[in-house]
């Protein structure tokens, strides 16, 4: 896939300074440069019209300007990255069907092809207002893990539901495997959600008016707010699970080790 086949799109990297599990993780050193700089540089490779770092803290602003990034300062009271994204879209006056990609600031090795496939998926589905990514689950253990978010889709590859629960359910198969180990059956349609989001600017403009849904509150999954409102979410399929991001200091050490082996 080449960038010539892509529609125009913008990338915003929400970069919150405070993190409950790993404070200041975006400024942590990874192979001689901050985690955030890795993310910014991979975003540049995607061929977007613009790449913007959105932050609420002057230390991140200073660091980002230092490595040549475009920065927009945002409020510090946002509940999530989508709210920060919506503020940037309004400030930049992006409107209508303009496509905006949310690339998380703690994903230094996100494959660029996932950005491309999700942008193309949204562009091709004119009824969808946002898109995301999923890949196949093959391990039974992952299927039953509540930290692995699952998604089921309709025949147009639009999301029907996201859940921490195992779905869809193999009524007969799981009854015969009480240990919940091993591999899922070949062809079993279990999909793991990957947290990359692509929006039309028109959806971001009305995001603040969308109330939190009961489903979102129970599952702790922000994307359920959109499904609850009847918003169509297109799901692009990835060939495999990308390298894990930086959620904890242990994650960072793993990436440092992999980088030292040149295995990323």
UniProtKB/Swiss-Prot annotation:
GO terms for molecular function: 3-deoxy-manno-octulosonate cytidylyltransferase activity. The lineage of its organism: Bacteria, Pseudomonadati, Pseudomonadota, Gammaproteobacteria, Oceanospirillales. It comes from the Bacteria. This is 3-deoxy-manno-octulosonate cytidylyltransferase. Activates KDO (a required 8-carbon sugar) for incorporation into bacterial lipopolysaccharide in Gram-negative bacteria. Its EC number is 2.7.7.38. Keywords: Cytoplasm, Lipopolysaccharide biosynthesis, Nucleotidyltransferase, Transferase. It comes from Marinomonas sp. (strain MWYL1). PANTHER family: 3-DEOXY-MANNO-OCTULOSONATE CYTIDYLYLTRANSFERASE (PTHR42866), 3-DEOXY-MANNO-OCTULOSONATE CYTIDYLYLTRANSFERASE, MITOCHONDRIAL (PTHR42866:SF2). GO terms for biological process: CMP-keto-3-deoxy-D-manno-octulosonic acid biosynthetic process; lipopolysaccharide biosynthetic process. HAMAP family: KdsB. It is found in: Cytoplasm. Belongs to the KdsB family. The gene is kdsB. It is an enzyme of class 2 (transferase). It holds the Pfam family CTP_transf_3. GO terms for cellular component: cytosol. It catalyses: 3-deoxy-alpha-D-manno-oct-2-ulosonate + CTP = CMP-3-deoxy-beta-D-manno-octulosonate + diphosphate. InterPro entries: Cytidylyl_trans, KdsB, Nucleotide-diphossugar_trans. Pathway: Nucleotide-sugar biosynthesis; CMP-3-deoxy-D-manno-octulosonate biosynthesis; CMP-3-deoxy-D-manno-octulosonate from 3-deoxy-D-manno-octulosonate and CTP: step 1/1; Bacterial outer membrane biogenesis; lipopolysaccharide biosynthesis.
